[in-house]
């Protein structure tokens, strides 16, 4: 999947670990949405 920035990773992509994965159809079972706002397409989820 495509990595994305969770709210817990920090304010910006620069210098932070991207611990989330973008899912287009919502987070799969056992995962949770880790970003309150965005990304524009899909959900940023993490296990």
Curated annotation (Swiss-Prot):
Disulfide bonds: 4-44, 6-34, 27-45
The keyword Disulfide bond is assigned to this record: yes
One GO CC annotation: extracellular region
GO biological process assignments: regulation of signal transduction
Gene3D superfamilies for the chain: Anthopleurin-A (2.20.20.10)
Pfam families on file: Toxin_4
Compartments it resides in: Secreted; Nematocyst
Alphabetical keyword list: Disulfide bond, Ion channel impairing toxin, Nematocyst, Neurotoxin, Secreted, Toxin, Voltage-gated sodium channel impairing toxin
Major subcellular location class: secreted
Single Gene Ontology MF annotation: sodium channel regulator activity
InterPro entries reported for this sequence: Anenome_toxin (IPR000693), Myo_ane_neurotoxin_sf (IPR023355)
Known role: Binds specifically to voltage-gated sodium channels (Nav) (site 3), thereby delaying their inactivation. Has a strong effect on crustaceans and insects (DmNav1) and a weaker effect on mammals. This toxin is highly potent at mammalian Nav1.1/SCN1A (EC(50)=6.01 nM) and Nav1.2/SCN2A (EC(50)=7.88 nM). It also has great activity on Nav1.5/SCN5A (EC(50)=49.05 nM), Nav1.4/SCN4A (EC(50)=109.49 nM) and Nav1.6/SCN8A (EC(50)=about 180 nM) and is less potent on Nav1.3/SCN3A (EC(50)=759.22 nM) (when measured as the increase in the slow component).
Family of the protein in this entry: Belongs to the sea anemone sodium channel inhibitory toxin family. Type I subfamily.
Protein name: Delta-actitoxin-Avd1c
Lineage: Eukaryota, Metazoa, Cnidaria, Anthozoa, Hexacorallia
């Amino acid at each position: 999947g495509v990595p994305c920035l969770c709210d817990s990773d920090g304010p910006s992509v620069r210098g932070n670990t991207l611990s989330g994965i973008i899912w287009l159809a919502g987070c799969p079972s056992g995962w949770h949405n880790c970003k309150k706002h965005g990304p524009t397409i899909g959900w940023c989820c993490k296990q």
